[in-house]
Design a protein with these regions (language model features):
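Juxtamembrane transmembrane-helix boundary motif
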Residues: 1-24, 38, 43-44, 70-163, ...
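Hydrophobic, membrane-facing alpha-helical anchors
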Residues: 6-11, 58-66, 145-146, 170-179
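Short helix-coil transition sites and intra-membrane helix breaks within transmembrane domains
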Residues: 25-34, 165-172
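Membrane-embedded alpha-helical segments of transport systems
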Residues: 58-66, 91-92, 99, 198-205
Length: 269
C-alpha cells in the first residue's frame, strides 16, 4: 500500500518534470510538446495513443497561452499577422491531412526531422554571420506597398504552413516560426511570440475535438500543465532577456537536437 503511494507520487513528480520540459520547449522554439508527452504517457502511464495526443494538446493550450502572455508583455507579438495566418492555416491543414494519408508515417517523421536539422544548421550559420552587438532589425524581407498585398501574402503563407502542418502532424508551431523567420524575416523574439499565439488557437481547436470524444486524461493533463506553466514562464523570461543572436543559437541547437532524435527514432524502428 505504502509502496503504491510512493510510486504514484514519483510518477506525478515525473509528470510535472515532463511538463516543465514541455513548457521550456514551447517558450524557446514555439513547438508543441506532443513529441515529448505522447511517448511518456503511453509508456509510463499506460494511456492510449488517442488519449495521449488529446492530453498533449490540452497541455499545449495551457503552455502556449502562458508563453504568449509573457511575450505579449514584452511587445513581441504581431496580432495582425496572427489573425490571417490562423484563418488560412486551418484551411490548409485540412488539405494537408489528405496528403498525409497517402504518405507512410515513418517517412513523414524522418523527413520532418531532416527539415529541422537543416533549419537548425541554417539558423546557426546565420547567427555567426551577424555582429553580436547588432540589434535585431524590424524590417522584413518582403515589402508591401498596399495592405491587401501583405494580407494576401500572409494568407498564402498561412495556407502553405497549414498544408505542411497537416502533412507532418504536430509541427504547426515550428513551421510557423520557420516561415516568420525565413520568409518574412521577423525579429526572432517577435517570431516566437507570434507563432506561440497562433499555436494556442490551433491547439485549442484540436483539443475541443479530442475532448468531445473523451480522449483527454484531465488528471495527468493538469499535472503536466503545472510543470508546463513553470517551464514556460522560466523559458520565456530567459528568451525575452537575451539578445536575438544568442536566442537564435539556442533555437538552432534545439531544432537540430529535435531533428536528430526524430530521425534516429524512425531509423531504429
Amino acid at each position: 500500500m505504502l509502496g503504491d503511494l510512493i510510486m504514484n507520487f514519483l510518477l506525478y513528480l515525473f509528470a510535472i518534470a515532463i511538463g516543465i520540459i514541455t513548457g521550456g520547449i514551447t517558450s524557446l522554439i514555439g513547438a508543441s510538446g506532443v513529441m515529448v508527452i505522447v511517448p511518456v504517457l503511453t509508456m509510463f502511464f499506460q494511456v492510449s495513443t488517442h488519449s495521449a495526443i488529446g492530453t498533449s494538446l490540452f497541455v499545449d493550450v495551457i503552455a502556449s497561452l502562458v508563453v504568449s502572455y509573457a511575450y505579449f508583455k514584452n511587445g513581441n507579438i504581431d496580432f495582425k499577422s496572427s489573425i490571417w495566418i490562423v484563418i488560412s492555416s486551418i484551411a490548409g491543414a485540412q488539405l494537408g491531412t489528405q496528403f498525409a494519408s497517402q504518405i507512410e508515417e515513418s517517412s513523414l517523421s524522418a523527413l520532418f526531422g531532416i527539415v529541422l536539422i537543416a533549419a537548425g544548421i541554417g539558423l546557426l550559420i546565420k547567427s555567426y554571420k551577424k555582429n553580436s552587438n547588432e540589434k535585431e532589425s524590424p524590417k522584413k524581407k518582403i515589402r508591401f506597398n498596399k495592405q491587401w498585398q501583405q494580407i494576401s501574402a500572409l494568407i498564402v503563407i498561412g495556407f502553405g504552413i497549414g498544408i505542411i502542418s497537416g502533412v507532418f502532424g504536430a509541427g504547426g508551431g515550428v513551421m510557423i516560426l520557420l516561415a516568420l523567420i525565413m520568409i518574412l524575416e521577423f525579429p526572432l523574439h517577435k517570431a516566437i511570440g507570434t507563432s506561440t499565439l497562433i499555436m494556442t488557437v490551433t491547439a485549442l481547436s484540436s483539443t475541443i475535438g479530442y475532448a468531445s470524444r473523451g480522449n483527454i486524461n484531465y488528471e495527468l493533463g493538469c499535472l503536466l500543465s503545472v510543470g508546463a506553466v513553470i517551464g514556460g514562464i522560466l523559458g520565456a523570461r530567459y528568451a525575452n532577456k537575451v539578445n536575438g543572436n544568442t536566442l537564435q543559437k539556442v533555437v538552432s541547437i534545439c531544432f537540430m537536437c529535435l531533428g536528430v532524435v526524430m530521425t534516429i527514432m524512425e531509423i531504429v524502428k
